[in-house]
């Protein structure tokens, strides 16, 4: 019985491998038929966005303001809009301040709520 099972399994495997190998022939022409090159980003390498190549989003600040550009858009010309690094630093500072507000065990200090 074991021998029969092994023989059946082997036949199935051999058939499958032969089919796959036959179907795989010429698959290297795929790149020539379609586009000829693998995926690449549309605008070349990812770089920090400058004011010139973005529209109303003002310098890619939406990555840090969770979808709303209003923080960077306060000054409409966006000349002084914070860079991503500055925004990150401000976030860190906020986080540190919030951490200071927490007392033992992560419970917020009572003084913050009842001055």
Swiss-Prot record:
Q: What does this protein do?
A: Secreted effector involved in biotrophic colonization of plant cells. Induces an early, basal defense response in susceptible rice, including rapid callose deposition and ROS production in leaves and calli. Also promotes sporulation and mycelia growth suggesting a role across the whole process of interaction, from the biotrophic phase to sporulation.
The record lists the lineage as: Eukaryota, Fungi, Dikarya, Ascomycota, Pezizomycotina
Q: Which domain of life is it from?
A: Eukaryota
The induction annotation reads: Expression is highly up-regulated in invasive hyphae.
Biased composition (Basic and acidic residues) is annotated at: 46-55, 91-115
* UniProt key word Signal: yes
Phenotype upon knockout?
A: Leads to a slight decrease in lesion numbers and lesion sizes after host leaves infection.
What keyword terms does UniProt attach to this protein? Host cytoplasm, Secreted, Signal
Does Signal count among this protein's keywords? yes
| GO CC field | extracellular region; host cell cytoplasm
Specify the protein name: Biotrophy-associated secreted protein 1
- Compartments, record wording: Secreted; Host cytoplasm
Region (Disordered): which ranges? 24-115
Leader sequence residues: 1-22
């Amino acid at each position: 019985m074991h021998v029969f099972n092994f023989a059946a399994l082997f036949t199935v495997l051999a058939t499958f491998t032969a089919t796959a190998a036959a179907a795989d022939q010429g698959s290297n022409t795929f790149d020539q038929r379609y586009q000829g090159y693998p995926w690449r980003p549309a605008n070349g390498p990812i770089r920090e966005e400058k004011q010139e190549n973005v529209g109303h989003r003002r310098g890619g600040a939406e990555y840090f303001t969770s979808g709303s550009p209003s923080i960077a858009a306060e000054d409409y010309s966006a000349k002084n809009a914070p860079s991503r690094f500055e925004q990150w630093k401000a976030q860190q500072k906020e986080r540190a301040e919030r951490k200071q507000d927490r007392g033992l065990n992560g419970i917020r200090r009572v003084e913050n709520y009842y001055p």
